Amino acid sequence: TIDTGSNGIIKFTTEGSERLRILSDGKVLIGHTSNIFSYKLAVFGTDGGNSGISASRFSNNTSPASLLLSKSRSATIGNYAVLQNNDEVGMIDFRGADGSDNMSKVAEIKASVDGTPGSNDMPGRLTFHTTADGASTTTERLRIHSNGNISIQTNDVGFSGAGTLRI
């Protein structure tokens, strides 16, 4: 059943239970009737089987399933303004409930520009951040630079060159 009531919300139900809701601002909710996050797509659930997003690929080749995060410096969709050094391109954000909300930061993985971009040339780095006990924000713990060097708990390179690092 599709309910397009006068409140600007579209609701999809099956077997008498609401399954999907589109809010008047275009946000899509799955598994809940109100949005507690500011994202365009929010999936809510009570167990691991119904509170995730899945991408699967079935093909007889080496191509994977994928998740694409991209960024342009333009404020107009469809315009592709070049990024700058240190621009954050994508982030995986991990949060948890602290008794008052579900927004306390646990950890982040960020992908950022690590140099000067050129035509089909986008130097990148990955950084891994965690929240210490008693803190409310994350701290960078590990960085993989665009040249392959790795920094642990500092922005300074701790190991460079070819070879194997064993800890």
Where are the predicted features?
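Trimeric beta-solenoid/beta-helix "fiber body" segments of extracellular/virion adhesins
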Residues: T1-K105, V113-I167
